[in-house]
C-alpha cells in the first residue's frame, strides 16, 4: 500500500506547559528516538504517523504546541478541527499538573471546534520516580473527573508512548461523530466495520 494511502486522517494536539516533554513524546512516537537535549517549540510543530487500527489505515497529524505563555494566542488557533487532545504534565513538577486545569483545559473549552473530541491526560517522566510530585492515583482521579483517558509515559525509557496514541486512536474510531467531521479536518473515505476486535499496528 502506498505511504499516502489511508482511510482516515485525524488531527491530534499535544498541549501542556513548557518542559513537560511534548516534543520528546512526539519524536519518540514518530521516529523511535529520544533526544536528550531539545529546544523549546516556537509556535507549533507537527509530524505525521500512520497507524492501522481495526483494519483501517489512519494518518495522524500530530501537532506539538509551544507551552510558553507568549505563544498562547498563536497556539489557540490549532485547537480547531482536532479530533484528539493530549494534555501532558511532568510528574516531577506539580505546577505542570495544576496548569492542566487552570490553563490548558480552559483553552480547550474555548477554542475547540469538535464537540466530541477525545481527551487524554498523559503523565510523563514516570522513570524519575524518586522525584515524583504527582501520584498515579491523583492523575487517574483528575483524568476521570474531566472525562479523559489516562496514560503514564516515559519518553526517555520508551514506556507506553505508543500505547497512549493507540488508545486515543481506538477511542476516536469508536466515536461515530468523529468519523464524519470532514469539515473540520477528519477525512472519511469509508466506514469502520463493526464487530471487529480492536487492534493497532504501526506501519
Curated annotation (Swiss-Prot):
It is found in: Cell membrane. It is a lipid-anchor. The modification Cysteine methyl ester is found at residue 203. GTP binds at residues 16-23, 64-68, 124-127. One of its GO terms (cellular component) is plasma membrane. A lipid is attached at residues 201, 203 (S-geranylgeranyl cysteine). Gene3D superfamilies: P-loop containing nucleotide triphosphate hydrolases. InterPro entries: P-loop_NTPase (IPR027417), Rab (IPR050227), Small_GTP-bd (IPR005225), Small_GTPase (IPR001806). SUPFAM superfamilies: P-loop containing nucleoside triphosphate hydrolases. The keyword Transport applies. The keyword Protein transport applies. GO terms for biological process: protein transport. Belongs to the small GTPase superfamily. Rab family. This is GTP-binding protein yptV3. It comes from Volvox carteri (Green alga). The lineage of its organism: Eukaryota, Viridiplantae, Chlorophyta, core chlorophytes, Chlorophyceae. The gene is YPTV3.
Amino acid at each position: 500500500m502506498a505511504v499516502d494511502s489511508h482511510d482516515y486522517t485525524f488531527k491530534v494536539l499535544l498541549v501542556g506547559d513548557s518542559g513537560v516533554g511534548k516534543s520528546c513524546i512526539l519524536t519518540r512516537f514518530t521516529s523511535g528516538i529520544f533526544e536528550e537535549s531539545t529546544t523549546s517549540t516556537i509556535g507549533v510543530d507537527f509530524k505525521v504517523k500512520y497507524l492501522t487500527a481495526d483494519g483501517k489505515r489512519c494518518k495522524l497529524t500530530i501537532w506539538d504546541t509551544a507551552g510558553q505563555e507568549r505563544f498562547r494566542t498563536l497556539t489557540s488557533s490549532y485547537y480547531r478541527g482536532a479530533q484528539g487532545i493530549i494534555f501532558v504534565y511532568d510528574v516531577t513538577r506539580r505546577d505542570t499538573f495544576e496548569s492542566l486545569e487552570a490553563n490548558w483545559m480552559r483553552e480547550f473549552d474555548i477554542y475547540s471546534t469538535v464537540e466530541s473530541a477525545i481527551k487524554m491526560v498523559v503523565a510523563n517522566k514516570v522513570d524519575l520516580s524518586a522525584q515524583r510530585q504527582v501520584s498515579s492515583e491523583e492523575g487517574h482521579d483528575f483524568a476521570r473527573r474531566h472525562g479523559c483517558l489516562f496514560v503514564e509515559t516515559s519518553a526517555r525509557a520508551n514506556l507506553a508512548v505508543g500505547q497512549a496514541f493507540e488508545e486515543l486512536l481506538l477511542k476516536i474510531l469508536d466515536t461515530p461523530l468523529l468519523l464524519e467531521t470532514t469539515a473540520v479536518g477528519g477525512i472519511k473515505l469509508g466506514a469502520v466495520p463493526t464487530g471487529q476486535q480492536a487492534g493497532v499496528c504501526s506501519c
